[in-house]
Amino acid sequence: MSTPHHILVGISGGVDSAVATCLLVQQGYRVTAVNLRLLDTLDAPYAEPTLQPSSLVVSDHPDYHIPLFSLNLSRTFRDEVMRYFNAEYLAGRTPNPCMVCNRQVKWAGLRHAAELIGANAIATGHYANRAFSDGRYRLYKGADSQKDQSYFLWMLSQKDLAHTLLPLGGLTKPEVRELAKNFGVRAAEKKESQEICFVPNDDYSTYLMSAMPELAERVADGDIVDAAGTVIGKHRGYPFYTIGQRRGLGVSAKEPLYVTALDAEQNRIHVGHKAALMSHRLLASRCNWIGMEPPSSSVELLGRIRYRDRQTACRVTPLENGQIEVVFQEPKSAITPGQAVVFYCGDEVLGGGFIEEGT
């Protein structure tokens, strides 16, 4: 990418994107902001997303009064993220919609908006870093290990990274808060949340029943089966459980029982003791490689199976069906189909894939 001069920054109304905007202005870029509206008019007929102009006052200082556009991507969000989310739960998997949203909605929407206004790069307030070396754009962890969001960006392409700036990558959250004060940022400090934005009150059961009215009749009253294959109870619907879950099973046992597998075809939940959650191996599909070419033979990498998981040495082997086999040196707990395994070399994100099964 040539040196950018006109940057389109995605803003959310929070401190992070506001500070990212101010930093870009301070660095001398011509900056325009866009608010991606993801949850508006979900039932409206499809229309090509169009930019609606406005203005943004990031702080009281006139240097930070910049052009603002809004882009309604609610239909795209519904089609690409919400339908994926629903389908994954129906298939007995536990999805991660933020990863899909980043690639399919946010980056795609920002790049589309940038083309419409003539910006030659986009920026976000994510805590991650990007660089170019050895003929390839590379993605790295953010400086703040507690806020690092690189795990959620493994689906980005070379073309995405080529047109992306990440102004907060070298900063910690306390430093961002201090900059917000110095800039006089008006944005509110949003409460940290791990909730899915379209699932009210983090109530997955109510959301799924509303999104798929036929679900209750289809999945209710299935069997809960122990490690010996004995039916020990009934469940209220396999989509309402996840691998590793202990609470809310409604069965009693001498030792705690955990969900070890979801069988959508048989409408069964398998449970076992905690040791049954441990496994060394998984299969993954729909892989995306950023920092390396897709492996043609076995390669030693570091892998994580969830956001707060620690990196563990693993051997990644490509299979003939397009999947990869991942074997960890140390066992992982509760490998969950539908979640992502993300690979690193130190702080660099090399790529990832969606987990199909753990064994």
UniProtKB/Swiss-Prot annotation:
Keywords: ATP-binding, Cytoplasm, Disulfide bond, Nucleotide-binding, RNA-binding, Transferase, tRNA processing, tRNA-binding. Its EC number is 2.8.1.13. One of its GO terms (cellular component) is cytoplasm. Pfam families: tRNA_Me_trans (PF03054), tRNA_Me_trans_C (PF20258), tRNA_Me_trans_M (PF20259). It catalyses: S-sulfanyl-L-cysteinyl-[protein] + uridine(34) in tRNA + AH2 + ATP = 2-thiouridine(34) in tRNA + L-cysteinyl-[protein] + A + AMP + diphosphate + H(+). GO terms for molecular function: ATP binding; tRNA binding; tRNA-uridine 2-sulfurtransferase activity. Gene3D superfamilies: Adenine nucleotide alpha hydrolases-like domains, HUPs, Translation factors. The keyword Transferase applies. ATP binds at residues 10-17, 36, 125. The active site is at 101 (nucleophile), 197 (cysteine persulfide intermediate). It is found in: Cytoplasm. The record marks 126, 339 as: Interaction with tRNA. Belongs to the MnmA/TRMU family. PANTHER family: MITOCHONDRIAL TRNA-SPECIFIC 2-THIOURIDYLASE 1, TRNA 5-METHYLAMINOMETHYL-2-THIOURIDYLATE -METHYLTRANSFERASE. HAMAP family: tRNA_thiouridyl_MnmA. This is tRNA-specific 2-thiouridylase MnmA.
